Structures are given as C-alpha cells and as structure tokens.
Amino acid sequence: MDKLADLNYTLSVITLMNDTLHSIIQDPGMAYFPYIASVLTVLFTLHKASIPTMKIALKTSKCSYKVIKYCMVTIINTLLKLAGYKEQVTTKDEIEQQMDRIIKEMRRQLEMIDKLTTREIEQVELLKRIHDKLAARSVDAIDMSKEFNQKNIRTLDEWESGKNPYEPSEVTASM
C-alpha cells in the first residue's frame, strides 16, 4: 500500500509541476517548455530514487563516505549527460584503476616489442650467416680435378661396345 501511495504521490507531483508550468508560461507554443519539463521530471525522479537508495546504502554499508561519493558522482554524471556534455566526473579510485589498466597495457606492449626485437636480431644474424656462406670468394687457380662432371669422362675406346651411346641412331616408326 505504501508503494501505491508513493506512486500516486509521484504522479500528483508531476501533474502539479506540469500545471504550474502551464500557468507560468501562458504561451503554449513556447519552444523551451519540453526541455524544462524534462529536466524537472528527471530531477524529481532522481530525488525520489536517490533518497531511499542512499538510506538503504548508508544503513547496510560500513563506509558511508564512499557510498555518498559514488551516488553524488553518478548523479552529476547523469546531469552532465542530460546537458549534452561528453565529459564525466571521476573519483580518485576510478582514475587509479584506469592508470593501472594503462600501465598493464604498456607493460604488455613493451614485452611484445622486446620479443619482436629479439626475433629481428636473430633474423639479422641468420641473414648475415647466409650472406657469408653465399659470398663469392676469389680463387687464384681453379682445380678442375675435383669437379664432379670431370670424373666420368670416357673415351671412345673405353666404352664397352666401342661406339658412343649418346649419338642419335636411326629410328623407324610404324604409321
């Protein structure tokens, strides 16, 4: 029953505010009326929602200062959003949490940079070794005795049948 009475009270206050605004502003076509009514409605809703919440929070919480601070910051941020500002009010706790998050991210990125730098150094060393192996060295006299294509040279006399097996022979094909 208390909730119903509270709801009726809330509706009657909103109706009273609207009636008061209509009586103050005679011109019904005034451009700012919806904005004023919206702001007053939001303020009244915040008032009705925050007071019971604050009472319950203060009774159940051990640290009432933090609860009040958090509620005030939330209310101020809500009003700033309604006014169209993108900035928000933050507490020291939130700033410290954001700083911790930023520091963790910076450490993670530094570790990644360190790993990448180590890999790049290893790749440069590998490329240097490959370059050193591929570099042409000048030789004064070339020893052809060690070439693999010079080992199995046969003369015509050394072949088994006495004729060159690589010479083309006459081939006949059926048509």
UniProtKB/Swiss-Prot annotation:
Membrane topology value: Single-pass type III membrane protein
Highest taxon in the source lineage: Viruses
UniProt KW keywords: Activation of host autophagy by virus, Calcium, Enterotoxin, Glycoprotein, Host endoplasmic reticulum, Host membrane, Host-virus interaction, Ion channel, Ion transport, Membrane, Metal-binding, Secreted, Signal-anchor, Toxin, Transmembrane, Transmembrane helix, Transport, Viral ion channel, Virulence
Assigned GO CC terms: extracellular region; host caveola; host cell rough endoplasmic reticulum membrane; membrane
Membrane topology (Cytoplasmic): 52-175
Lumenal side: 1-28
Single GO MF annotation: metal ion binding
Residues noted as binding Ca(2+) in the record, renumbered to the chain: 120, 123
Regions crossing the membrane: 29-51
Localization terms from the record: Host rough endoplasmic reticulum membrane; Host membrane, Host caveola; Secreted
GO biological process: monoatomic ion transmembrane transport; symbiont-mediated activation of host autophagy; viral process
Residues carrying sugar: 8, 18
Swiss-Prot/TrEMBL domain comment: Binds 1 calcium ion per tetramer.
Oligomeric and partner information: Homotetramer. Interacts with the immature particle in the viroplasm. Interacts with host CAV1, early and late in infection. Interacts with host integrin ITGA1/ITGB1 heterodimer. Interacts with host integrin ITGA2/ITGB1 heterodimer. Interaction with microtubules blocks trafficking to the Golgi apparatus.
Biological role: Plays an essential role in the virus replication cycle by acting as a viroporin. Creates a pore in the host endoplasmic reticulum and as a consequence releases Ca(2+) in the cytoplasm of infected cell. In turn, high levels of cytoplasmic calcium trigger membrane trafficking and transport of viral ER-associated proteins to viroplasms, sites of viral genome replication and immature particle assembly.
Family: Belongs to the rotavirus NSP4 family.
Name this protein carries in UniProt: Non-structural glycoprotein 4
Gene source species: Rotavirus A (strain RVA/Pig/United States/OSU/1977/G5P9[7])
Lineage start: Viruses, Riboviria, Orthornavirae, Duplornaviricota, Resentoviricetes
